[in-house]
């Protein structure tokens, strides 16, 4: 079994402006510096003495020597009567090395790749009429018998980007398991509500086009859906039976703009 030779010690004064260690000529594997416990108060001349032995290089030793060199430099800094923040910063600058902090920015268009919060729900108007898909792109409001409740459409309500306030929440209303979303477009001189087919690979997304966005407002136990593209125009139903839903302006008037919402799953 190999035996470890006894280290031979000698004393030398140590000083370095560059905080470098002293190494053997053949590389950093063998090292000359070994720090022994120091009593700085006992050194009259204020110098730093290191005891030298042949030992393997250790990263922790480099840190210890760096701190000792920093202490040596501190001895040469004139002491002020009051310790201030600037003094503390100068001490830290001797011991720690600053590293740049890099902030990454992202394009808003990339946010569509992130998950969009949504819930599934059913809507009934104030007269308890349910919404059903009467044709591929037409929603109608009518009273359903118990045996026909499965005809009622289920909405996927997505929470999207918009002008959110304390009482208004921007949402998009899509039909569950269908590539159809309610949207608002101008036809002639009047905003019109329609079901628009979309690409399921792209929708829903956080940054929806404004025609798909409705500001949901809760009033007591009911909700209203105002078009974000056409303010003061609301998703409405007629008091007559089995009529298509539409965009109306007579809030609280003849047309019905308030709905009850049954949440199926958050």
Curated annotation (Swiss-Prot):
Entry GO CC: cytosol; extracellular space; lysosome
The entry's localization annotation reads:
Cytoplasm, Cytosol; Secreted; Lysosome; Secreted, Extracellular exosome
Checking Gene3D superfamilies in the record gives: 2.80.10.50
Q: Which GO terms describe its biological process?
A: cellular response to lipopolysaccharide; cellular response to mechanical stimulus; cellular response to xenobiotic stimulus; defense response to Gram-positive bacterium; fever generation; hyaluronan biosynthetic process; immune response; interleukin-1-mediated signaling pathway
Sorted UniProt keywords: Cytokine, Cytoplasm, Inflammatory response, Lysosome, Mitogen, Pyrogen, Secreted
Q: Which SUPFAM superfamilies is this protein grouped with?
A: Cytokine (SSF50353)
UniProt entry tagged with the keyword Lyase = no
Which is a Pfam family this sequence falls into? IL1
Query: Site annotated as Important for interaction with integrin: where?
Result: 168, 176, 178, 187, 201
- State if RNA-binding is listed as a keyword: no
Q: How does it assemble?
A: Monomer. In its precursor form, weakly interacts with full-length MEFV; the mature cytokine does not interact at all. Interacts with integrins ITGAV:ITGBV and ITGA5:ITGB1; integrin-binding is required for IL1B signaling. Interacts with cargo receptor TMED10; the interaction is direct and is required for the secretion of IL1B mature form. Interacts with HSP90AB1; the interaction facilitates cargo translocation into the ERGIC. Interacts with HSP90B1; the interaction facilitates cargo translocation into the ERGIC.
The UniProt family comment states:
Belongs to the IL-1 family.
- Output this protein's name: Interleukin-1 beta
Organism from which the protein derives: Delphinapterus leucas (Beluga whale)
Query: What is this organism's lineage?
Result: Eukaryota, Metazoa, Chordata, Craniata, Vertebrata
């Amino acid at each position: 079994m190999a035996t470890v030779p006894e280290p031979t010690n000698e004393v030398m004064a140590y000083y370095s402006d560059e905080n470098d260690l002293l190494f053997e000529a053949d590389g950093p594997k063998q090292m000359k510096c070994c720090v022994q416990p120091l009593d700085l108060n006992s050194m009259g001349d204020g110098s730093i003495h290191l005891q030298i032995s042949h030992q393997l290089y250790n990263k922790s030793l480099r840190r210890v020597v760096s701190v000792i060199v920093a202490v040596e430099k501190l001895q040469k800094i004139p002491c002020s009567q009051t310790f201030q923040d600037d003094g503390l910063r100068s001490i830290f600058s001797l011991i720690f090395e600053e590293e740049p902090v890099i902030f990454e920015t992202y394009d808003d268009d990339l946010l569509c790749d992130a998950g969009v919060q949504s819930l599934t729900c059913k809507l009934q108007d104030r007269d308890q009429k349910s919404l059903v898909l009467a044709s591929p792109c037409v929603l109608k409001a009518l009273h359903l018998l118990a045996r026909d409740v499965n005809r009622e459409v289920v909405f996927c309500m997505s929470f999207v980007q918009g002008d959110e306030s304390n009482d208004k929440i921007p949402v998009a209303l899509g039909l569950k398991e269908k590539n159809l979303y309610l949207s608002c477009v101008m036809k002639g001189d009047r905003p019109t509500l329609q079901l628009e087919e979309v690409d399921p690979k792209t929708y829903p997304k956080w940054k929806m086009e404004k025609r798909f966005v409705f500001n949901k407002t809760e009033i007591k136990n009911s909700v209203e859906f105002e078009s974000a593209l056409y303010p003061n125009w609301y998703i409405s139903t007629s008091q007559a039976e089995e009529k298509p839903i539409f965009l109306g302006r007579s809030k609280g008037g003849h047309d019905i703009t308030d709905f009850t919402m049954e949440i199926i799953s958050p």
